[in-house]
Amino acid sequence: MLVERKTMQGIISAVRRNSLAENAGIKAGEKLCAVNGVSVHDIIELSYLVADEQIVLTIEDSECRQRQIVIEKYTDEELGLEFEAAVFDGVTTCYNNCVFCFVDQMIPGMRESLYVRDDDYRLSFLYGNFITLTNMKEEDFEQIIKTHMSPLYI
């Protein structure tokens, strides 16, 4: 069973002092909806979308009002944004029932996040989480190929 990813925005958890984002008036708690008109699904995609000298950010405030901000920058210059989560559209979870699943074999009483049966290739790339590749959509494989995402832990 494949999970449809929902469109979400990246919730901004912090804005670094004296950064491009702070100078543009972006605040913690606001949401990044798009870069140059393209919806952003995760911090990996964000890094590709902002690698330009001029970008247009679509930001949503706490009252659901959107505004566009034009930022001129060096191609490798960071915006100074930090996000609540690395993926903005929800984590893909594993629906397999493998007898050898290490998550199912963990002892009780550990921290909650260890019991999440994530199967998200983005978390594999970012944090070294293991994935099965069985819960992926065609677009996921295309994104891996397009961005040369490696290593992935299978």
Question: Model regions: which residues?
Answer:
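A residue-level detector for short acidic-glycine micro-motifs
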Residues: 14-17, 34, 48, 61
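PDZ/PDZ-like peptide-tail recognition elements
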Residues: 1-10, 48, 53, 58-59, ...
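Short, structured beta-strand/loop micro-motifs enriched in basic residues and often containing a Trp
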Residues: 8-17, 37-40
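Terminal peptide-recognition signature
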Residues: 21, 29-32, 57, 101
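Short, surface-exposed secondary-structure edge patches
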Residues: 20-25, 47-48
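Short, Lys/Arg- and Gly-enriched loop/turn segments at beta-strand edges
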Residues: 38-46, 65-68
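Conserved PDZ fold ligand-binding element
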Residues: 23-41
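Conserved Radical SAM active-site core
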Residues: 64-69, 73-154
